[in-house]
Structure formats: structure tokens, C-alpha cells
Amino acid sequence: MKFVDRFRGAVAGMLRRLVVEAMGVALLSALIGVVGSAPAEAFSRPGLPVEYLQVPSPSMGRDIKVQFQNGGANSPALYLLDGLRAQDDFSGWDINTTAFEWYYQSGISVVMPVGGQSSFYSDWYSPACGKAGCQTYKWETFLTSELPQYLQSNKQIKPTGSAAVGLSMAGLSALTLAIYHPDQFIYVGSMSGLLDPSNAMGPSLIGLAMGDAGGYKAADMWGPSTDPAWKRNDPTVNVGTLIANNTRIWMYCGNGKPTELGGNNLPAKLLEGLVRTSNIKFQDGYNAGGGHNAVFNFPDSGTHSWEYWGEQLNDMKPDLQQYLGATPGA
């Protein structure tokens, strides 16, 4: 009888977990469009010295569009990385914020790679095949080798001592770039990212989101969930490296409660609550490992929305300038 009771309990527990996981998958599928496509119209005002570069990428076999604002000769760079539904015309940072205005004459060069939908700014194992066809995704190689070399040679921008800031999908991407390229990225900003992708349902949720966004497959990126690439690209697993590198971290995640800034819609509220747990988990690991070079902003408000990410980018500007040694007005 005890065996039967235990068996029934185990089955009931398994069913509960399956229901919860199914609800999570369904929820993410319904919500992931919250950072969806915006009009093909850049926000930056006329008169700002914004350039539209076509940077050769031998690794991806094509030129990559990059929006760029020069901060002066030998200035550090701020790489702004986009969300899951990154467009091919303009960066979401330019469409949805006044980032170029905020950082004009800051002494920091602003670099916005365009495109890379669902890429996680990673080097994929296989071609990225989606609804629009197939292409090669070698974004880590581009961001850490091809692009900085181009900017150094053509725009006199420092290839080291720079920052990577990403939102949503790119929150973990920015952290991963800093983990493996610490000389280039001494400062990293993560906003509302899912920071434990290898954990439990992480691979399934990411695969579902990528499929919904553009028909992409997570296995083409990092292989099956058992592949080491999932842990290799997990900031929470590798938090010790960030601590050892003494990387400066600025991390933000709201709790799903809107403020007067906006984002008062159900998808934005629920999705922010969904990713907050992984951010707190990262913070716990960072503190437990003795980390002491981070700013954690986890307010009792904020939704998965550009209004909050833009505010954070503006707020971190003095910290960025000081840490990168920028010379304002250059």
C-alpha cells in the first residue's frame, strides 16, 4: 500500500511539474512578442553625427550594418546589443531610445550592430535557418574580432577597455562576451535578461521563443540541451569568471509592476516577472563568490519595456564614463 501511495505521489508530482512547465512554455510563447517589431524609422534627431557603416564580416560571409557615433580618437566603445526580434533596418536602441543623443560628446563611441534576430550574439554550430531562409551566425566572432579591428583601423576607436550592454535576449549575451573577452569588455550591462539558460526548461523556452520570432531552432545554435555550449553561455554558471576578471557589472530587472514610465500591458508585466528570478539567482551567486564590482537595480517596479531600459542606459552614463576613462566633449 505504501508503494502504491508513493507511486501515486510521484505521478501527481510529475503531472504538476509538467503542467507548470507547459504553462511556462505557453506563457513565453504568448509574451515573447512584447519586444516585437517597431516601425522602420530611426529615432535619432537630424544633426547628430550618426554614421551607417557596412562592416565586412568574413566569418558570416556578408557585410553587417552598424550604426555608429564617434566619441573621439582613441575613445572607448559602448556596444549596444538588441533584443530577440532585432530588425535588419535599424537597432532597437535607436528606434526606441535617444541613446545617440544621451551619449553625444560623452567621450564614448556608440556602436549599434543591426540585425541578428534570435542570434543571442553567439557563434552558432549550424546555419541559422528561419522563416526568411538560412544565413551564417558568427556574431561573437564579429563583435570581438572583425568589428573592433574595423573600428580601430577606420575610426581610431580603442579595441579594448570597452562596454557591452544588452537587453532581454542580449542581457546574457553581453555578460557572456565579457566572460570570454575580458580585455575588450571591462564593463557590462544586462537589462531584463534570462541569465540561467542552461537551467531546467531554459533550452526549451529559448527554442520556443526563437521559433516564434523567426522560425529558428535552438539546437542549431548550441546543440541539444546536454551540449556544453549551454553552460558555456550561461552567465550564472560562469559568474566566478566575471568576479575573477573584476568586470564592472550594471544589472537591472523590474518586477512587472508598471510606473508612470509606461509598459502597462499584460505581456510586459508578466515577462519581466518571469525573468526576474534568474537575475536574483545571478546576484546571489555573485555575492556568494565574493564579487564587489557590481550595481544591482532590482526595484519593486518596472516591466519588460523599452522605457525602463532607456532610463537605465541614461542612468549608467556617469558610471560608464568614469570606469572607461572617457574624456567628455572629445
Curated annotation (Swiss-Prot):
Annotated InterPro entries: AB_hydrolase_fold, Esterase-like, Mycobacterial_A85_antigen
Disulfide bonds: C129-C134
Statement: the UniProt record of this protein carries the keyword Transferase: yes
Cellular compartments annotated: Secreted, Cell wall; Cytoplasm
Record GO cellular component, one term: extracellular region
Top EC class, one word: transferase
EC number: 2.3.1.122, 2.3.1.20
Region Fibronectin-binding, annotated ranges: 100-110
This protein's name: Diacylglycerol acyltransferase/mycolyltransferase Ag85A
Organism annotation: Mycobacterium leprae (strain TN)
